Amino acid sequence: MKYLWFILLICSPLSFAASFDCAKAKTPDEKVICSNLKLNDLDVEMSVKYHFLRGLFAMGVSGEMYDSQTAWLKQRQKCKGDTTCLLQSYRARINQLDKLYNLIEKPI
C-alpha cells in the first residue's frame, strides 16, 4: 500500500504545492500550511489520498467522504496557526484515509 501512495504522490501535479492556492490563503491555518514545508507536504499527501479514495466509491459513500472532509476542514481551522495542532490534525486525517483504503477489497 505504501508504494501505491508513493506513486500517487510522485505522479500527482499537486506534489509541489499545497492543495489550495497559497496566494489566496486567508485563514491562519492556511497561512501556516503554506509557510511550513512539513505541513505543506502533509496537505498534499492528504489531498491526493482523499481524491483518490473518493474516486473509487459510488455516490453515497463519496458523499459521505465529502461530508467527512468538510467536517475535518472545519476542525482544522480551529487549530488556527498552531503548528503542533495542525500536524496532529493532518496525521489523524491521513490515518483515517489509510484505514479506509485498507478496507477496500483488492485483487491479489
Task: Set out the residue ranges of the language-model regions.
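Sec/Tat signal peptide C-region and signal peptidase I cleavage site
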Residues: 5-8, 13-17
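N-terminal alpha-helical modules
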Residues: 16-108
